[in-house]
Amino acid sequence: MSAVLARPDPTDAAARIRTLAREAGFQRCGITGIELGEDEAHLRSWLAEGLYGTMHWMAQHGDKRSRPQELVPGTLRVLSVGMDYGRKDDTEAWDTLHDGRRAYVARYALGRDYHKLMRNRLQKLAERIQAEVGPFGYRVFVDSAPVLERALARNAGLGWIGKHTCLIDRGGGSWFFLGEIYLDLPLPIDTPATAHCGTCTRCIDICPTQAIIAPHRLDARRCIAYLTIEHDGAIPEDMRKPIGNRIFGCDDCQLICPWNKFAQRTDEPDFRARNDLDVATLPQLFAWDEAEFLRRTEGSPIRRSGHERWLRNIAVGLGNAPGSEDVLAALESRRHDDSALVREHVGWALAQHGL
């Protein structure tokens, strides 16, 4: 008869899990329970106001998003982890934003898509935990299911939810990705993080489109990240000028946050900028045909936007750029593009230059 290994003491198991998480490449981790009552009420209110735009999946799945035990029956605890993606400094980001000919791509999207990388590491982490504590039920998530990941991360002690709705770690800023493992292990839980924004409103004040309509209240319909990534139609005209040269996402509310002076700079090779996206100009990127777009965005989160939206976004950026010869030539090259969506945005951009 084979021997049955006794489960380790829950406190010892939790400590070992944290060690394994850090060995797996996660710079922060914590364990929390599954109670999200206040966050459920906040989510319901946000949905009722229609602030989610066309992201209809936010309203799907009922209360499973805020009730882990309904999404994955048997769940008792959630292991929340964070992986840094901060770059060497913020100067380069501000320099790009202030140079109208250059294209600004949100920092998280400059390198490899984090979803697959983190999911693989979380899966391996779960397997290592099983090898040490014995079989248990679990499910891994990386922005891939209805999960209130920031609320869970806050409760697990990883940081607090800032007024811009991003998670902030007092000792590491906000430049990090989140992932979770739902567990059926009765582990001791960590202390939730407390807020330290105080009276600061820098993120609210700097938002180019005034999308942060109140502390902890984001109107996605005005958010540049939503407009350039999630929204699949025409960008509202009153939003186009404020978008500036931001062609995929926006980081302003994080760049201005004082806590990011403590942000940890990643040494993860997969998060390094690809295809010179951190220095590319708008005309250069506008010249990509669909085949080149697909080739250069392989393994990148940018691919999910599709070539048409990519061109739509860059057209807006070109409309806001200084009217140099190459900017105008780039726009003229797509005046008669096959896509009506692209043509409309190119027409708007040309009009900004008096053409």
Curated annotation (Swiss-Prot):
This one is known as: Epoxyqueuosine reductase
Ranges for domain 4Fe-4S ferredoxin-type: 185-217
Q: Which InterPro entries match?
A: 4Fe4S_Fe-S-bd (IPR017896), 4Fe4S_Fe_S_CS (IPR017900), QueG (IPR004453), QueG_DUF1730 (IPR013542)
The metabolic or biological pathway listed in the UniProt record of this protein is:
tRNA modification; tRNA-queuosine biosynthesis
Q: Please list the residues that make up the active site.
A: D143
Q: What does this protein do?
A: Catalyzes the conversion of epoxyqueuosine (oQ) to queuosine (Q), which is a hypermodified base found in the wobble positions of tRNA(Asp), tRNA(Asn), tRNA(His) and tRNA(Tyr).
Q: Name one GO biological process term.
A: queuosine biosynthetic process
* Family statement: Belongs to the QueG family.
Broad class of where this protein is predominantly found: cytoplasm
Query: Which sites bind [4Fe-4S] cluster 2?
Result: C207, C223, C250, C253
* Subcellular location(s) per record: Cytoplasm
Which keywords fit this entry according to its UniProt record? 4Fe-4S, Cytoplasm, Iron, Iron-sulfur, Metal-binding, Oxidoreductase, Queuosine biosynthesis, tRNA processing
This enzyme catalyses: epoxyqueuosine(34) in tRNA + AH2 = queuosine(34) in tRNA + A + H2O
Is this entry keyworded Ligase? no
Q: Which cofactor does it need?
A: cob(II)alamin; [4Fe-4S] cluster
Oligomer and partners: Monomer.
Q: What class of enzyme is it?
A: oxidoreductase
Q: How is the cofactor bound?
A: Binds 2 [4Fe-4S] clusters per monomer.
Would you say which domain of life the source belongs to? Bacteria
Q: Which residues does the annotation say bind [4Fe-4S] cluster 1? A: C197, C200, C203, C257
The GO terms describing molecular function are: 4 iron, 4 sulfur cluster binding; epoxyqueuosine reductase activity; metal ion binding
Q: Which GO terms describe its cellular component?
A: cytoplasm
Q: Whose protein is this, by species?
A: Xanthomonas campestris pv. campestris (strain ATCC 33913 / DSM 3586 / NCPPB 528 / LMG 568 / P 25)
Its Enzyme Commission number(s) read 1.17.99.6
